[in-house]
Amino acid sequence: MKTLLLTLVVVTIVCLDLGYTRKCNKLVPLFYKTCPAGKNLCYKMFMVSNLTVPVKRGCIDVCPKNSALVKYVCCNTDRCN
């Protein structure tokens, strides 16, 4: 019984990514990157003049404020950008 319990604990630890980090899309959404530690948000950056085409995507630690020229959209799930 102890062996079974130990086996289940080991399998659980292996299956769970204990050092889990966020995965965010790159500019072309077919490709993504694993974010470094501390950067737990994904973002898209748009030019205000054209809100349909993002000009940059990636990982970030804090969502920047929008400006008169640039709009940011941030999210906190894998590949949400």
Curated annotation (Swiss-Prot):
Tissue: Expressed by the venom gland.
Alphabetical GO biological process terms: killing of cells of another organism
CDD domains: TFP_snake_toxin
The keyword tRNA-binding is assigned to this record: no
Gene Ontology MF, one: protein kinase inhibitor activity
Keyword vocabulary terms for this entry: Cardiotoxin, Cytolysis, Disulfide bond, Hemolysis, Membrane, Protein kinase inhibitor, Secreted, Signal, Target cell membrane, Target membrane, Toxin
Gene Ontology cellular-component annotations: extracellular region; membrane; other organism cell membrane
Compartment(s) where it occurs, according to its Swiss-Prot or TrEMBL record: Secreted; Target cell membrane
Disulfide bonds: 24-42, 35-59, 63-74, 75-80
Gene3D superfamilies assigned to the protein according to its UniProt record, in alphabetical order: CD59
Quaternary structure and interacting proteins, as annotated: Monomer in solution; Homodimer and oligomer in the presence of negatively charged lipids forming a pore with a size ranging between 20 and 30 Angstroms.
Similarity-based family: Belongs to the three-finger toxin family. Short-chain subfamily. Type IA cytotoxin sub-subfamily.
Function: Basic protein that bind to cell membrane and depolarizes cardiomyocytes. This cytotoxin also shows lytic activities, but 2-fold more important than that of CTX-A2. It binds to the integrin alpha-V/beta-3 with a moderate affinity. Inhibits protein kinase C. It may interact with sulfatides in the cell membrane, which induces pore formation and cell internalization and is responsible for cytotoxicity in cardiomyocytes. It may also target the mitochondrial membrane and induces mitochondrial swelling and fragmentation.
Protein name listed in UniProt: Cytotoxin 4
Natural source organism: Naja atra
